[in-house]
């Protein structure tokens, strides 16, 4: 099985963009990502609005050359939410809600068992639910309906807080109900059998709207590298270029696994990971992270990568929408294109800090995955407050919890998006 995907085509695209990418990297180093050519004024405005900030206020600060002190007191967080500080690289602090939401998102990500006609395992890939009955992965993972019919997807294959593997759920694929794929976009969309346990996984909407990501932001990947228990690469892949169909993101340590969802910091899916640009020696052989010549038995997670490539979600949705389907499959597609994920039940909390004082405590959702966190990440936790919850939904008639996201009331000036993370700042 070609576990590495279309590397040659990815490498060619990457080399063709050397000059543009170096220009982008220069702007990123100077913390001037709003000047990057791919970040057009309209896209920047859409991104700012999606973060529930005031675009006129933010852009006026940019034009006036005002610097920010994100630790200072004072201005309205609606004008400059902390999420936007991270976009502009002025604040790397992440609230604990970010990790709780990441755990809940991860439920929809599964390990694909790729099997031969005799039932033997050929390899593994990653896939994720994009509706209650549809799974998205790479075409090089499931190249045909016949291959999909032999394969299965396993959810909840991950370690718990004590390091033990949790009980997982194996689900059959149902390509006879729906199977779509495309070689250029390297995606396969396949129906899954209607198992009762799927409801607990939820699903991740494919949002066609613009404004989910700017060049210069970091992205997060949830994956099963080489078939291993579920892992998260958090904020250690930086988007360095945007093409018509793809985005390129660089990392020093974290590869992506074929078929993995790529997320922004609001846990919206922005790309389908499918390939990368590996390091090579003078003989054009692939190298491992410790400098050896790579062999396929080592698994793709051992390759030393220069960059990763993901297929843009907006292009995937556009292609899926345009394909001819038999009438019986149309309801499945319409759920993907238009339905909203139902609210996910919170998993039972686990006490991590010993017996708390009355009214105090710290909880996280059960079902812990492995985090891959860069050393620069600083997390500040206060144990003096109430147990953590998803912000801003209980008792608030103006907000609605949908899957992982808090949906704000629609308005003419701002699109629906993940709830803002408030933060004070000072001019």
Stretches with model-predicted labels:
Residues 1-12, 16, 20-24, 195-199, ...:
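C-terminal cap/linker of serine protease catalytic domains
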Residues 1-125, 338, 342-356, 360-361, ...:
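Protease-domain processing segments flanking chymotrypsin-fold serine proteases, especially trypsin-like
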Residues 67, 79, 202, 266, ...:
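Residues in intrinsically disordered, low-complexity segments of regulatory proteins
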Residues 83-117, 121-124, 128-132, 136-250, ...:
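Serine endopeptidase catalytic core focused on the charge-relay Asp
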Residues 153, 256, 360-366, 425:
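Low-complexity, proline/glycine-enriched flexible segments
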Residues 364-397, 404-407:
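N-terminal accessory interaction module
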